[in-house]
């Protein structure tokens, strides 16, 4: 196993970002609950600890505090924002409410570079988010940097290798922030950079073989990035012991079923079973217009269809899943609990426990960007590795109102035009998502000398990093005009195309 950096989570919304930045430096990181016993961290062999930020004051009645014994483990520690205040509080310093709170952009002046700031310019732009500040240094510490309102924006205890910073190096707003993290990992902790795609694949293949033995593994394949990479990794490990089940729910994009069949059956030679349940899904969705009800019907029907499909496949001991690392982190309200608490992941897509299948989740240690790297290394085509997110209920949440075969056909054809033009123009891989939405509204149009009364299609194209926030993409007007012209001319039943220019928040990316 690779060397591990422990990230203790104290409720920061940026905890996952810290973990990702560490991995970008080819060092393995793992997020732990803030109260994780020091003994556990010692047993798991962590070579360094990062204390995350958090929304609380260290003096608050229910403020999250770590096991004090972590400071006796003899490993380097880096405190970020709330984390540096914890270090001050526990090690004999003093924390106080700042007279001028620091939020947003700020400026850092480095006084003593030391190992943390080695090789960096003396002055840097940083990103702040704190109301408290360190007012008195703990014994053994020295100030290394200052900001506008903090005389201790950077501190260090070289003997114990404890470092603290009163800003967020993990966000892109902080200039050279990743270099600071890298300095801590390599220069202070002595990390070997042994977390690579090649090494992960080798370890994952060995783990899958050890766990599965000669047993059969069933994987629900959607054609999306996560399930595709999981399928490729499982197949590399156990070959013919893997059977994939693809459910055609009638809510797929144009040509999707044929594409999946060609890719996995013919290219990867995976045992793929395709179940056509499109008529059943549409029958159960008939007359339903409420979004949440549609989602529940689609979810329940999928579970039922998938369970029946498994009976035709034959005996299997394991169910494979494309679970990712963010999936095993449960978001909870801030209070005495952190924003991200590691939990045992039991979400198997709603599949009944009576199936008594054990889980194999080969991607559960990875973030999305790492999954894409693994997919590329396993030989998956670019259009799969970099495929845009697609909702679980499929086009069912992109048809407003009742889902009918006719409405789906209109949406499917319009979406295909948008996809073609986004690919041809080179914008497909530059945006987070681009798709069409069918609106059950008829408007007056003119074709030739005849008046028409046809439907409206909305274009939704957004830019984002993690889907938590998003902004509408400013595509060239000429491209938008061409897309609109093609849809209204080539897709029967559409007379008007509109553009959604809403950001998230307040709008969500999907319409339902």
UniProtKB/Swiss-Prot annotation:
GO MF assignments: ATP binding; GMP synthase activity
Pathway: Purine metabolism; GMP biosynthesis; GMP from XMP (L-Gln route): step 1/1
Residues covered by the Glutamine amidotransferase type-1 domain: 4-194
Pfam families for this protein: GATase, GMP_synt_C, NAD_synthase
Residue sites binding ATP per the record: 222-228
All copies of domain GMPS ATP-PPase, residue ranges: 195-387
Record note on quaternary structure: Homodimer.
Protein name: GMP synthase [glutamine-hydrolyzing]
Organism: Opitutus terrae (strain DSM 11246 / JCM 15787 / PB90-1)
Lineage, highest ranks first: Bacteria, Pseudomonadati, Verrucomicrobiota, Opitutia, Opitutales
